[in-house]
């Protein structure tokens, strides 16, 4: 059987298993055993014993035949994609890999816009000379490659703006000077644009070793989540946006150097009507000395700029909040400021009076004082709904009698989230006695049920 048929069979098997019943089983497994064990099991299923991510990835790469077929596809919408890259004394092997990965694209309507800021006062610097020789050679070989040589290094944001000035496409893609695209990256982007008319979109990614031979640490991202984006720049690479939106932003801002892309992404999604996610690994993020991908602490200023980007986003959209670093760099915690302290009705449900009394005492000792506490006589839904009708509070907090402890500022945090426009409900994470996740929120089903 051919490799292509094997791939199709694998996709079919996965799609057959991804049904309502198995999703339900998955949530039940998490409830009983915790996320850590579930993730271990999921990895074992996805990457069988003895199979590394690299092997899995190479098995799922498009074949030469598939790439050939992609080149023959005629989309009804065929946008020119302008890929912008600021280069700075890029190691020649990385530079070649980066440019070659664009030239190998199965979707060929692109332009590569490079602003080189390698010059740092010495025109005879060997690094500068070699980079510019390579850029000259590539731009002579392929007219889709545009290069501007800057008189000095202006910083990553301003250098990127110089690359943006070269762009004439309908969409702009952000690309780092030492990373690589998969050969089907632009094809998948354009396919998604044709299918869904996205204003901005992003893809999954992984890390690539310094010698370009090993793939690791894949990041399979969720669909667009504004709240998650405010906790972590999970979008990162590969990010593509309509030029009409980019033009309205006024480019990158140098005061966010290090996280200028984070700030840029926030401002793009604020203007976008449709944000899309292409759930395929289409971008390889290079790991090497000095790269954030290799050592997070090597660029602490980047994380400080990220914190500033989130804070600025909140100010633009009218959310009163304070952002702080979490222990793991690159993750941020938001403290929402309470504009007022509305009455919260805590509705405790259960059948054990002693447990309900103990649960009630927990809430009386918390930071939030404007409370009323109501307790049901059992777990009957009608009775709980009747208490909700009776409640005087602006917010209703439903909690089981089995709750044994609550973070001191839990109500303050959750009420703060409810102040955000378009947020109608919020839920916290519930940890069981065995340190397993009992609950981590609710979702709406397509039929409207929770």
Task: State where each predicted segment sits.
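Catalytic donor-sugar/metal-binding loop of nucleotide-sugar-dependent glycosyltransferases
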Residues: 256, 266-284, 311-323
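N-proximal low-complexity "stem/linker" segments adjacent to membrane-targeting elements
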Residues: 39-101, 319-362
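Short, acidic, metal-binding catalytic loop of nucleotide-sugar glycosyltransferases
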Residues: 100-109, 361-370
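Conserved donor NDP-sugar-binding/catalytic core segment of glycosyltransferases
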Residues: 184-215, 403-447
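A recurrent flexible, glycine/aromatic-enriched loop bordering the glycosyltransferase active site
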Residues: 157, 165, 215-240, 244, ...
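Short aromatic/hydrophobic "clamp" motif used to bind/position activated sugar donors
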Residues: 172, 396
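A conserved acidic beta->alpha catalytic loop
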Residues: 116-132, 152, 351-356, 377-381, ...
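Glycine-rich, basic loop-to-helix element that forms the pyrophosphate-binding segment
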Residues: 150-167, 378-391
